[in-house]
Amino acid sequence: MNTYPKLFSPIKIGETTVKNRVFMPPISTNLADKGYVTDALVEHYAARAKGGVGLIVTEVTTVEPTYVYLPGDMSICDDSYIPGWEKLTAAVHKYGAKILPQLFHRNLRRFPVYHLSMHSHYEPVGILGILLPLPH
């Protein structure tokens, strides 16, 4: 008897059909190089797709170059990142899985800031210049 009869059945999300209901949540690997997809990242996500995951949500993916949560984060802040993402997407699609980025942006909390091109530390920032107190 199958305890979870729908687990391996397709599911439609909007216009997209996912081959099963096995979803991989975002898990940081810090394998990107200054925001760019690396071969190690492609291998990592392709292995999960090959193993049967239906939908993969990538790790933190920054949307602006002046704010990175960790130096090994992925990015899509400009078109120079597209070739790596195309390679990653093709590798995951090869095994019938879908993939989407976990979009990451700064918020009202202060965090250390790393610039993608230098990985140097900047002062804490917040959206619109509004900063909430740091938690204790």
Located regions from the model:
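Flavin-dependent oxidoreductase catalytic cores
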Residues: M1-H136
